[in-house]
């Protein structure tokens, strides 16, 4: 809004009508290692406020971005509670780098972020992402969480309890349609056929001897509850400010057993204080604890299975509904058993996230006017993630009614035997250190100069192990297992077992004249441990320029264009890199024990590869792919040209971009 002065003249009540100020509409947006006024941005940067995001209710902030930022695509692959099976990309070029409060973090951490804690999100879509180097080829998503402000303490609570239900379920055939279709299929067999169901089978359903099975009603619940509660407290003084929040979320799946569900706890604290003149200390701490519970069989297989069953055969062999039926069911699989953890077993996925950062900022302008606009910032961050997973397969029996003897035949469902327990443990950590010097100052009201120079070091580690054991007793503990066939091993995927490090020198300089002519250049000299010596460092520069036509005197003098608050032309070009798909491919490695022939069992013609030494069989080791020390990151050369329009005091905004992105060096 526009500033407005009003004389008090002894009045105790003053009514003031505020007017929109287009300059205030030109808000501050977050960019790489800093902020800029939207009107001064020369890159393709889009932003959305947290308060606008939460208008769309969803457990995943990633979904809340759908349709809100041009060029950002979000698609949801599954609605199963807690899976977060989503993907997003910037301009169709792969998953972007996620930066939360200045710290690179994973997509999983962003998905579990409490949306009520988000202040704003900016997306760098063009060469402006070059300052993030070898991980910015697909763009950058910058997330800023809420901070406290000076003033009275404010309490906030937001809660909801909602119900979800399928929009429409598939309509099942009645038994007569089903039997007719089976008969037609059999009779039209190329080799000739016969009736599968006789007239007596049709009559059994007509007279009530046999009844239709409504698998929809047996498996799918009418409604699935979901609840969310968030509470926050914020406030502070001119020197000390704080924001503290807690959140709880619970979502149940659509299975009637209730064994498909997800719950999450969030905690966040952002505190800043001025410890001395011009010296500010900031501490940010957050924690996430979540748990996803599922039946042992995947939701996809459960739904696929009950669709195959039809309506002709019952879920239970006895009228009382205590004995699970297998007779007549496809592959003898009973969907009721598959969806019920007490019968067939369960899987639990527990994750705990701890994130922290400590920042010390010095404003040298507080000591002398000569250094006005010069600040230095040092930050250290430590993140830790722990996963504790269980998979318990439980042996169970199924039954079939024998009409001749009037008894029930019992047998173990083959795929449930023997009972089995698997435990998995993963831990991942990240340390990050940043030191930056920033300068931002305007001379003679027309020359604005800004810049940043800094150094960044990051180390990441991942470790894991798992154990699998067949059980002598059907109880979810490894101690109940037998010694034969037990397994203890590690996952060796790129995201499971790793040690990685990055270092970088970063820089940016901005210049604007009369807030009309804008220039920016930035770079990142980035190093990655994923490559061999001599190939670890790369230089990633970018340049951009802008012209704010709406600030030109000739433009402002045209009365019919008074409604235009902003009209800006901009262009950028830069080189970005990506090392995400690479994993020390320059180093020699071996696979042990060696596998060949049947890769699933690690054997060849029934025998594991190896040799006999001293009467003992020794498994063989086989070399991995031939190492290549010349492997390095692939590059993305990006050109973007566009314009931004804003009119009628922000009531209408239009952005247009043409971009071209050329990738080189990517493996075929």
Q: Model-found features: residue ranges?
A:
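Short, small/polar-rich motifs associated with maturation and membrane association
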Residues: 1-252, 256-268, 280-282
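Acidic, glycine-rich flexible loop segments
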Residues: 190-213, 228, 301-337
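Extracellular/periplasmic, surface-exposed regions of secreted and cell-surface proteins
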Residues: 53, 270-279, 284-289, 295-308, ...
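Short, ordered coil/turn segments that flank beta-strands lining enzyme active or ligand-binding pockets
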Residues: 100, 277, 319
């Amino acid at each position: 809004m526009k500033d407005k002065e009003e004389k008090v003249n002894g009045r105790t009540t003053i009514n003031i009508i505020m007017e929109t100020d287009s300059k205030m509409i030109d808000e501050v947006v977050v960019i790489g290692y800093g902020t800029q006024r939207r009107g001064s941005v020369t890159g393709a940067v889009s932003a959305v406020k947290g308060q606008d995001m939460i208008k769309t209710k969803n457990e995943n902030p990633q979904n809340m971005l759908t349709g809100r930022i041009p060029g950002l695509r979000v698609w949801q692959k599954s609605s199963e509670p807690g899976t977060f099976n989503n993907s997003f990309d910037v301009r169709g070029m792969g998953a972007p780098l996620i930066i939360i409060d200045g710290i690179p973090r994973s997509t999983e951490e962003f998905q579990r972020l409490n949306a009520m804690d988000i202040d704003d999100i900016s997306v760098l879509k063009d060469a402006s992402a070059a300052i993030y180097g070898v991980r910015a080829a697909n763009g950058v998503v910058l997330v800023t969480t809420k901070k406290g402000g000076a003033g009275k303490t404010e309490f906030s609570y937001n809660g909801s309890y909602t119900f979800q239900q399928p929009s429409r379920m598939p309509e099942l055939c009645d038994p007569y349609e089903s039997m007719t279709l089976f008969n037609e299929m059999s009779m039209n067999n190329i080799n000739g056929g016969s009736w599968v169901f006789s007239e007596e089978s049709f009559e059994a359903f007509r007279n009530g001897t046999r009844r239709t099975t409504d698998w929809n009603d047996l498996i799918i619940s009418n409604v699935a509850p979901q609840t969310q509660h968030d509470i926050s407290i914020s406030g502070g003084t001119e020197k000390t400010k704080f924001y503290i929040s807690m959140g709880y979320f619970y979502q149940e799946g659509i299975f009637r057993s209730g064994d498909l569900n997800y719950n999450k706890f969030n905690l966040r604290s952002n505190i800043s204080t001025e410890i001395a003149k011009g010296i500010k200390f900031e501490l940010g701490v957050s924690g996430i604890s979540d748990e996803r519970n599922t039946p042992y069989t995947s939701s996809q297989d459960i739904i696929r299975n009950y669709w195959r069953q039809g309506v002709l055969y019952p879920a239970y062999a006895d009228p009382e509904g205590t004995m699970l039926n297998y007779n007549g069911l496809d592959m003898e699989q009973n969907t009721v058993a598959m969806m019920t953890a007490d019968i067939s077993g369960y899987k639990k996925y527990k994750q705990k996230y701890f994130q922290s950062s400590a920042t010390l900022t010095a404003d040298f302008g507080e000591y002398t006017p000569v250094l006005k606009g010069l600040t230095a910032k040092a930050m250290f961050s430590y993140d830790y993630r722990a996963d504790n997973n269980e998979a318990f397969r439980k042996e169970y029996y199924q039954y079939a009614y024998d009409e001749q003897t009037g008894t029930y035949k019992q047998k173990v469902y083959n795929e449930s035997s023997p009972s089995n327990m698997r435990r998995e443990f993963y831990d991942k950590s990240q340390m990050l250190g940043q030191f930056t010097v920033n300068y931002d100052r305007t001379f003679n009201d027309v020359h604005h100069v800004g810049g940043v120079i800094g150094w960044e070091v990051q180390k990441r580690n991942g470790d894991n192990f798992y154990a699998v054991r067949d059980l002598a007793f059907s109880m979810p503990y490894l101690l109940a297992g037998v010694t034969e066939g037990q397994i203890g091993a590690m996952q060796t995927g790129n995201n499971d077992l790793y040690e990685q490090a990055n270092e970088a020198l970063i820089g940016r300089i901005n210049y604007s004249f009369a807030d009309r002519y804008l220039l920016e250049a930035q770079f990142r000299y980035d190093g990655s441990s994923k490559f061999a010596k001599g190939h670890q460092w790369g230089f990633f520069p970018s340049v951009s320029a802008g012209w704010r036509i709406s600030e030109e005197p000739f433009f402002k003098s045209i009365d019919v264009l008074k409604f235009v608050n902003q009209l800006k032309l901009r262009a950028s070009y830069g080189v970005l890199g990506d090392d995400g798909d690479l994993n020390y491919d320059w180093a020699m490695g071996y696979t042990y024990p060696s596998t060949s022939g049947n890769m699933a069992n690690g054997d060849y013609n029934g025998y594991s590869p190896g040799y006999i030494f001293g009467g003992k069989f020794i498994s063989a080791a086989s070399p991995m792919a031939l190492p290549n020390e010349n492997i390095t990151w692939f590059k993305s050369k990006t050109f973007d040209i566009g314009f931004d329009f804003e009119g009628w005091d922000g009531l209408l905004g239009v952005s247009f971009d043409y971009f071209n992105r050329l990738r080189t060096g990517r493996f075929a």
